[in-house]
């Protein structure tokens, strides 16, 4: 365990997702049992007292890999030297708030954080955005960090990806480990397109194994796309532990690489692949190696999939237009 600690910054660290995430990171779920981690935790001033309590719990776990913890409300201080930033904190949608209000409220947060990352983060920084609306929040942060390569920003669609794998496993009676090449296209919203037409169940085409277009269209896709709302209805609170788990999965695969013969879903900046407008942060199938991602190329997109991809990317374009008009990018 001689390697220098990976400096991991987490925003919204005292929140529900943060509470699940920090213990996963400190226990070695991110980089395994040999790489120590230093946590740098950002919160708003009113939440710092609660965050102190979380740090007390982290101390009480005596995690061998946790080399240190720093907390604060100043992003320029907390992001200093960070190798990985997980932007979890975001303004939730309150009663009577329009989506444009939400974009504006979060715009201020992610503008400031993008600027701070640009100034003080380590040269090898990778930035994962979990706080919603994640795709557009990532776009805002990226646009305010001109010195950081644009491919270093990603928004979380791994939770949708994991949800889709789980639903497909349940339908086919397979194990989750039997399922490969799941894809989420587009926005982390109800318009997202979970695509099983390229996925495999035990090496066989998933759509053919299912053999039921009606299930795909009217059961599978809406269940995955609206899973967050279903959890709120059941639990009385939004999904936190599963979001933390997916945040860890996404960061681990980004840093350590995807397994051979498989890919993952990440929302990354579009280069125009699959007709997704250039410059949008949209979910694609990607492979990763040495901390870099590559969009999987050459997949055939049928008419059904095309219409779904177009719908979700149109929503992303609308969000980009809205934040452009607000002067956030």
Curated annotation (Swiss-Prot):
Keyword Oxidoreductase in record: yes
CDD domains xrefs: MDH_chloroplast-like
Keyword rRNA-binding tagged: no
Entry EC no(s): 1.1.1.37
Residues given in the record as substrate binding sites: 93, 99, 132, 163
Entry keywords, A to Z: NAD, Oxidoreductase, Tricarboxylic acid cycle
Role summary: Catalyzes the reversible oxidation of malate to oxaloacetate.
Listed PANTHER family: MALATE DEHYDROGENASE
Name of the protein in question: Malate dehydrogenase
């Amino acid at each position: 365990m001689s390697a220098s600690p990976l400096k991991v910054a987490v925003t919204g660290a005292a929140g529900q997702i943060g509470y699940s995430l920090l213990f996963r990171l400190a226990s070695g779920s991110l980089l395994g049992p040999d790489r120590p981690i230093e946590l740098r935790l950002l919160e708003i001033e009113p939440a710092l007292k609660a965050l102190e309590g979380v740090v007390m719990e982290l101390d009480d776990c005596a995690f061998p890999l946790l080399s240190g913890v720093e907390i604060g409300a100043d992003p320029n201080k907390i992001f200093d030297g960070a190798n990985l930033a997980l932007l979890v904190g975001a303004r939730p949608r309150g009663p009577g708030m329009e989506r444009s209000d939400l974009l504006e409220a979060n715009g201020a947060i992610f503008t400031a954080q993008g600027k701070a990352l640009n100034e003080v983060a380590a040269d090898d920084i990778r930035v994962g955005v979990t706080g919603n609306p994640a795709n557009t929040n990532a776009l805002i942060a990226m646009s305010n960090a001109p010195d950081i390569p644009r491919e270093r920003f990603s928004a979380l669609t791994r939770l949708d990806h994991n949800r889709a794998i789980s639903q497909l496993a349940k339908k086919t009676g397979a194990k989750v480990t039997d399922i490969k090449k799941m894809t989420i296209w587009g926005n982390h919203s109800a318009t997202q397109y979970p695509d099983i037409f390229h996925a495999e169940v035990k090496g066989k085409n998933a759509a053919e194994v299912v053999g039921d277009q009606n299930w795909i269209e009217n059961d599978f896709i809406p269940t995955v796309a609206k899973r967050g709302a279903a959890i709120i209805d059941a639990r009385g609170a939004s999904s936190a532990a599963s979001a933390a788990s997916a945040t860890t999965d996404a960061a681990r695969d980004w840093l350590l690489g995807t397994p051979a013969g498989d890919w993952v879903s990440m929302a990354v900046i579009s280069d125009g692949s699959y007709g997704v407008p250039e410059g949008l942060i949209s979910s694609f199938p990607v492979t990763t190696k040495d901390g870099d991602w590559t969009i999987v190329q050459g997949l055939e997109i049928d008419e059904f999939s095309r219409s779904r991809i177009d719908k979700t990317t149109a929503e992303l374009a609308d969000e980009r237009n809205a934040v452009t008009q607000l002067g956030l990018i």
